[in-house]
From Swiss-Prot:
Subcellular location field: Cell membrane
Topology class, membrane: Multi-pass membrane protein
Record key words, sorted: Cell membrane, Membrane, Transmembrane, Transmembrane helix
NCBIfam families for the chain: HI0507
Native source organism of the sequence: Azotobacter vinelandii (strain DJ / ATCC BAA-1303)
Protein name (database record): UPF0114 protein Avin_40830
Phylogenetic lineage: Bacteria, Pseudomonadati, Pseudomonadota, Gammaproteobacteria, Pseudomonadales
Protein family membership: Belongs to the UPF0114 family.
Primary location group: membrane
């Protein structure tokens, strides 16, 4: 009975595979949204104010960062929790493939969240005259919470690796 339960639990890791496939569908949706933004931007780029253009570009950078986060979580999550990727010889292989454990994945996700939050904060500050001061304060506090959390996670991961 114990062996059956252990094998069933181990096999259940494959239930994560459709979730990672779903993330690739989400990446496709993000890509479509990105090019929709490009399509709307190009006809008006010469008549846009510089600040408005920068806001659109920051939005596009934000989408690129979220896309990178999706790829990182999708691939390293699959490798860490489901199965190793069997990439054919001669194909491009990402440098970090097979080297990122769940701890380093958490740190990369935290760093990505801080970067995404930074872009959002920059967009907010570019439009600060339209936003009440109390909301600006909340944006900064939330961003600082992400930053401090990333530092704490990094410190704890370093301490855990040092203890081993």
């Amino acid at each position: 009975m114990e062996r059956f339960l252990e094998n069933a639990m181990y096999a259940s890791r494959w239930l994560l595979a459709p979730i990672y496939i779903g993330l690739s569908v989400a990446l496709l949706a993000l890509t479509l949204k990105f090019f929709q933004e490009v399509y709307h931007l190009l006809p008006h780029v010469l008549e846009m104010a510089e600040a408005e253009l920068i806001l659109v570009l920051l939005s596009m950078i934000d989408m690129a960062l979220v896309g990178g986060l999706l790829v990182m979580v999708m691939i390293s999550g699959y490798e860490n929790f489901v199965s190793q990727l069997d990439i054919d010889e001669g194909k491009e292989k990402l440098d970090w493939l097979g080297k990122m454990d769940s701890g380093s994945l958490k740190l990369k996700v935290a760093a990505s969240i801080v970067a995404i939050s930074s872009i959002h904060l920059l967009r907010v500050f570019m439009d600060a005259q339209k936003i009440p001061n109390d909301k600006l304060l909340w944006y900064v506090l939330i961003h600082m919470t992400f930053v401090v959390s990333a530092f704490v996670m990094s410190y704890l991961e370093k301490m855990a690796k040092h203890a081993h």
